[in-house]
């Protein structure tokens, strides 16, 4: 085996990964949603089986902090819109990214309230509560670190229910506190609930990457329990009415998309019911309902939960709830992507540029892997030295494949050569490459992160395709510098066009990933020269053997 055959192996692994990812996307198509209506009454009404009644019409109030711009409906106190001022919708745009939305085209809401036998959100007790508020707009003032939005409702029996949203400066975690004052003569049985509901199919203006394999990340529901740290739940599974229904102490429920997440984290000592539901009208939901608590006559009961609505910032999410940081979609190689990101973030704290951080981490990774790379080239050099003996053996034994195989194994053993020695380092490099791919696609810190010159977003493709072309050029030079024993005409043709094929593939890949591959190729060129010089001294390499 030689380095050009190794390139072929990399290509096959790479193409196999792309085919697998495309197959995963095709075999789990998102169901086609029916037309959604502008109001949310019909969709939410279908959730009555889960104890979440229809919203109906209420007054919309505005709640703004330095990082959140929320719209809350006084009917039920649901968050119907969430804008993130710190995250532009698009590069160089003045419009903030919208996470939650209630429109004729798309519904994504964070619902919450009090249900149970005596809860005002129980459908059996009538329409959802219409809360009273002191004003229509709440703004976190300069110098203020906390903003409270109290909403009150008094039922026909005189019981008072207060729902207070508590927001803090620079924080995407919103505390939702409930106070229940029992003015009656019987205990009140109350449960809290939190539900996220979303249109299953994205409208055209939001569907920015479902047809592009390079932008494929998970969009759907997820949950966490003490037994299951992180479990995804696909929208199409909910649409097929294969619903979640489990009990858990602690944990959370969430809806995820690339870079952003919404999650409900219940805070109580009892058991919560985690569920998913097909609400009809093309809308899926995931939520929790707490174990009922009793509020005695003349007493006040307190309950609370937390809503995360914002970017997937791992350290902040981990501080809000255990394992909430796992919502960052690093795919099946998360155990490699997470430490890579921590290292990348540490480097960024010194250099202040994500592009230069990628360059530095590339040198670190390739430096750590240098012993394997050296072993790979040494093994390939020994294999090349054995080629004349192997060729003579083939001519001597003719078509006796069994004898050829036996004598080749004996030859490898006698010469202390591992025929797979050139492949093993590749099997290590490929997962690292794919883990970096997932890291770049899943880390919100790299979203719209500039590098230099024309690269203004490392998570997006190069708009002028300069980096992919440079990558192809470096790959071409590696090929030219590598010795080869490939004699099969078909393999020779494949190897000739391999830089072109890879260049085409990388046209749509994130600039940060292409940058990593360019730097990695440059390191390979340097390491090749150093290793070949050492092999020449040992008589295992000759520059005359290079392919011209």
From Swiss-Prot:
InterPro entries: Membr_insert_YidC, Membr_insert_YidC_N, YidC/ALB3/OXA1/COX18, YidC/Oxa/ALB_C, YidC_ALB_C, YidC_periplasmic_sf
Name listed for the protein in its UniProt record: Membrane protein insertase YidC
Domain of life assignment: Bacteria
Primary location group: membrane
Subunit structure: Interacts with the Sec translocase complex via SecD. Specifically interacts with transmembrane segments of nascent integral membrane proteins during membrane integration.
Keyword line: Cell inner membrane, Cell membrane, Chaperone, Membrane, Protein transport, Transmembrane, Transmembrane helix, Transport
Gene: yidC
Localization annotation: Cell inner membrane
Membrane topology of the entry: Multi-pass membrane protein
Pfam families in the record: 60KD_IMP, YidC_periplas
Protein family (similarity comment): Belongs to the OXA1/ALB3/YidC family. Type 1 subfamily.
Gene3D superfamilies, per the entry: 2.70.98.90
GO cellular component, one term: plasma membrane
Biased composition regions of type Low complexity, renumbered to the chain: 30-50
